[in-house]
Design a protein with these regions (language model features):
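Acidic/histidine-rich, surface-exposed loop or edge segments in extracytoplasmic proteins
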Residues: 59-67, 140-151, 301
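Alpha-helical cap/lid subdomain in secreted, periplasmic
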Residues: 128-270, 282
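Conserved SGNH/GDSL esterase-like catalytic core that processes O-acyl groups on lipids
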Residues: 75-161
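Structured segments of extracytoplasmic/periplasmic soluble domains
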Residues: 71, 75, 80-91, 145, ...
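Conserved catalytic region of serine esterases and O-acyltransferases that act on ester linkages
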Residues: 32-34, 249-340
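Hydrophobic alpha-helical membrane-insertion segments, chiefly the h-region
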Residues: 24-34
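Serine-esterase "nucleophile elbow" of acetyl-processing enzymes
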Residues: 37-102
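N-terminal Sec-pathway targeting helices
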Residues: 6-24
């Protein structure tokens, strides 16, 4: 009798579990179909270009910057930006951040963080919860980025809509705050080709999808771009065309070494972080980075593995050239090649 009843209970539980799974899948499918049939509003390329016709004014003082992202932000790179800004005379530069491990803008917004990874990524002293930080109205610039693979993020995590939510949230509490989307990169092992994706994704995905959707909201205004991916592509082409430089032979030398002796395809070492920090500095402050220090400190106070003087010089030259060639950075445009 008990065995028979147990079987009936087990069968019912399986039935309910199956029904629950079907219901969950049905909801997910419904959301997907709704998004496919009701795409978000987007700005045309002409409307986006019009937003960037007038450059931003260079900041007159050190900026308070808030960074939202994942491991391609990390605890070290924002600190490099602060040190470089201070070396350039902006003593008041400071920052806070909230990071996740491969976290999307949607997951940050909904606070859907796996506890272990969220705690691991935010042990640094500059952590401050994102919603609290933006509501405080204590920041001059808000820099945010999306997870990669970017195509998956756009399709499954509604990148443009959540970029718009974050931007509108920041604007609500600080109308004059400068907003920046930090363009990152995919792994060097990506099937479509690393340089091809870097050079194609800026217009197609970062600007043409994420920003076009985000800036279609009337409460967002202009979001500028920190073009780290474009700089990385240009730097790698320049570096490899010269056959490498002291301390850096090719693109792979920008990425961390894994325990098995192979290079991580996406996470930067100190040299790569320095390059990305230069892009942030130049975009945020309109500063010519040439001649700035290349020996910096990590977030834990230890000395970073500095690029050689030759590598640092090429990085600085490429950053200054590329950032001034893209209207979305907010800098006055220079159509020359590497001039002063």
């Amino acid at each position: 009798m008990n065995t028979h009843m147990n079987r009936r209970l087990f069968s019912r539980r399986r039935l309910w579990a199956g029904a629950s799974l079907v219901g969950t899948l049905g909801i997910a499918l419904g959301v997907f179909l709704w998004r496919e049939l009701n795409p978000p509003a987007t700005l045309s390329p002409e409307a986006r270009a019009a937003l960037y016709q007038t450059p931003l004014e260079p900041p007159e003082r050190g900026l308070a910057v808030y960074h939202l992202g994942h491991s391609l932000v990390g605890p070290d790179m924002p600190g490099y930006v602060q040190q470089l800004a201070q070396a350039a005379g902006h003593e008041g530069a400071r920052y806070h951040s909230q990071l996740g491990w491969g976290t999307s803008l949607r997951a940050h917004w909904e606070q859907e963080h796996p506890e272990a990874s969220f705690a691991e990524m935010n042990t640094h002293t500059s952590f401050r919860p994102a919603h609290e930080a933006l509501v405080s109205a204590e920041y001059d610039a808000f820099v945010f980025t999306e997870m990669v693979d970017l195509k998956d993020a756009i399709r499954w995590h509604a990148s443009g809509q959540y970029a718009g939510k974050w931007a509108a949230h920041a604007r609500e509490h600080s109308p004059e705050m400068r907003l920046y989307l930090y363009e990152t990169w995919h792994g060097t092992d990506i099937a479509e080709g690393w340089l091809a994706r870097l050079e194609g994704d800026l217009e197609t995905l970062w600007e043409g999808t994420i920003l076009a959707q985000a800036m279609a909201r009337p409460d967002v205004g202009t979001i500028h771009v920190i073009p780290a991916g474009q700089v990385m592509a240009a730097f790698v082409r320049a570096l490899e065309s010269e056959g490498g430089l002291p301390g850096l032979k090719n693109r792979h030398g920008l990425f961390i070494m894994q325990p098995d002796g192979t290079r991580d395809p996406i996470h930067l070492n100190d040299k790569g972080k320095y390059l990305v920090a230069l892009v942030h500095l130049t975009t945020l402050y309109h500063i010519d980075p040439r001649g700035l220090p290349h020996a910096l400190l990590r977030a834990d106070g230890s000395a970073a593995d500095a690029p050689s003087p030759e590598v640092a010089r090429l990085m600085q030259e490429v950053v200054w050239q590329i950032v001034r060639s893209l209207p979305a950075t907010g800098l006055p445009q220079d159509t020359g090649r590497g001039g002063s």
